[in-house]
């Protein structure tokens, strides 16, 4: 459930596979779910390279992963695959926090992974000119401040002091955004593509929940009938 919630918001993803074990049943499941929820691009990291001495085994695992990606309509032959060890990179950085590019082979492999992500996964066009809309992913109560709803802004912008509507599940109600935060940084505004927390005036935690949306007043209405597509994941 958490994987689906997160993946549905992604511009791209990193598929991590153990180089020592190869693709596991959950690897297939994650690739399938990524395709079903519309993750457009993937980059692969073959982890635990330090546990594999046989270069042919690494090649075999890479081939398996590429075939699996192709089965689920990802471009398996073209997707970048980086081989390394997250643990070895963490150990190197823990021992020498000032490690820079070129100082350690394991750290360099992680940097190469991020370079591939930057190059292969395109930054999509953000719909910042459309009416503000954010699906509520989680809700928190902060003592002394109020209720914070978190989520990824799907479209538009939101500024501190603007009025919004809480739509869905319960009766639609209005409130004012008194704070916008992203990764513990206070912002003046958030925009499409940002994962933010919105502090909402006069709203209690029980007034809002996942499944509701926060939107520009009058821009969206709840419906009791809709058409949808269901994919039943079998074991």
UniProtKB/Swiss-Prot annotation:
Gene label: tufA
Subunit structure: Monomer.
UniProt superkingdom: Bacteria
Organism: Gloeothece membranacea (strain PCC 6501 / SAG 26.84)
Protein name: Elongation factor Tu
Main location: cytoplasm
Function: GTP hydrolase that promotes the GTP-dependent binding of aminoacyl-tRNA to the A-site of ribosomes during protein biosynthesis.
InterPro entries found in the cross-reference section: EF-Tu_GTPase, EFTu-like_2, EFTU_2, P-loop_NTPase, T_Tr_GTP-bd_dom, Transl_B-barrel_sf
Signal peptide bounds: none
Binding site for GTP: 47-50
CDD domains reported in the protein's UniProt record: EFTU_II
